[in-house]
Amino acid sequence: MGCGMSTEDKEGKARNEEIENQLKRDKMMQRNEIKMLLLGAGESGKSTILKQMKLIHEGGYSRDERESFKEIIYSNTVQSMRVILEAMESLELPLEDARNEYHVQTVFMQPAQIEGDSLPSEVGNAIAALWQDAGVQECFKRSREYQLNDSAKYYFDSIERIAQSDYLPTDQDVLRSRVKTTGITETTFIIGDLTYRMFDVGGQRSERKKWIHCFENVTTILFLVAISEYDQLLFEDETVNRMQEALTLFDSICNSRWFVKTSIILFLNKIDRFKEKLPVSPMKNYFPDYEGGADYAAACDYILNRFVSLNQAEQKQIYTHFTCATDTTQIRFVMAAVNDIIIQENLRLCGLI
């Protein structure tokens, strides 16, 4: 009797293989929903990434949605100038032109939240005049010594446009607007065959205890670090360096028992501000073991190695990207690369590669 496989056996084997492949495909379908957790210290750029996803994958902002950002942008702009003027008092920096004192009073008279369809003309004029004052400029250069919104310069430079009665926020205006995230916000979008549910959680220390609710079945963690903050102190604790806080937080996330099998993507963000700062604020002043001077590539390598070296699990790969979260073209490219990483991870976890 021959030892070859019978037709019936061959058909049975083929059926088994088809069933196994179908099970793998079903498993893959279950994994087509990607739960992505956005983590990072306060003001690292998490909310900006969410806004970019809306611009890139959801057709952007409607006119009504843009209108809704006006009051936030007005408030950000006025509040930023107020912060500088208060810092001038504590740093004992005088105005160059004493006539601008009138404009200082105009800014201080404004409420914390600016309401209305347009910025009052006297407020726009006050900010424009003060931004030209050499004393204000000197204080701005020392902004690492106090807590100033990243978008301050952008809005001050655009004040003439923002103060127009028919002003409508642009994509860039919206991206740079800042509202502190409290609680958990979710954004859903589709890239190819994958549905992403992206969760943004508050980055300030007081918000971190709420993260635990997001941890179950997380596919990927997108961890953001504002590398431009190497010379700044925490908003919540002005004895702690912001970069050191980010390193401590990344260590706890990367090596957490919750995330043993979770892929981690690290965005080293705000490279534009980082590049501007390096020549004027030596990194060695804050990280004494750094030897690269003002060299941008050397500084990037140093920071990258500081974060990646915290990973204690040999089998866990950290995927890294240097980013500028307000640059839509770059974020579109980077998120396409992230999508490819997640597809490969899915195939591997489902046993298809």
Curated annotation (Swiss-Prot):
Q: Where is this region: G2 motif?
A: 173-181
Q: Where is the lipid attached (N-myristoyl glycine)?
A: 2
Lipidation feature positions (S-palmitoyl cysteine) = 3
- Per UniProt, GTP binds at 43-48, 150, 175, 181, 203, 269-270, 272, 325
What InterPro entries does this protein map onto? Answer: Fungi_Gprotein_alpha, Gprotein_alpha_su, GproteinA_insert, P-loop_NTPase
Keyword Zinc-finger listed: no
Q: How does it assemble?
A: G proteins are composed of 3 units; alpha, beta and gamma. The alpha chain contains the guanine nucleotide binding site.
Its gene is: fadA
Top-level taxonomic group: Eukaryota
Q: Where is this region: G5 motif?
A: 323-328
Mutagenesis or variant effect for residue 42 to R: Loss of intrinsic GTPase activity leading to constitutive signaling
Q: Which UniProt keywords apply?
A: GTP-binding, Hydrolase, Lipoprotein, Magnesium, Metal-binding, Myristate, Nucleotide-binding, Palmitate, Transducer
Function (record text): Guanine nucleotide-binding proteins (G proteins) are involved as modulators or transducers in various transmembrane signaling systems.
Upon changing residue 203 to R, the result is: Reduced growth without impairing sporulation
What is the name listed in the Swiss-Prot or TrEMBL entry for this protein? Guanine nucleotide-binding protein subunit alpha
Region (G3 motif): which ranges? 196-205
TM spans, by residue?
Answer: none
Question: Which stretches of sequence are listed as region G4 motif?
Answer: 265-272
From the Swiss-Prot or TrEMBL record, what is one GO molecular function term? GTP binding
Q: Does the keyword Cytoplasm apply?
A: no
Q: Which Pfam families match?
A: G-alpha
Q: Where is this region: G1 motif?
A: 35-48
In its UniProt entry, the species of origin is given as Emericella nidulans (strain FGSC A4 / ATCC 38163 / CBS 112.46 / NRRL 194 / M139) (Aspergillus nidulans)
Enumerate the residues binding Mg(2+).
47, 181
Region described as Disordered: spans on this chain: 1-25
Q: List the disulfide bonds.
A: none
Listed GO cellular component terms? cytoplasm; heterotrimeric G-protein complex
Q: Where is the composition biased (Basic and acidic residues)?
A: 7-25
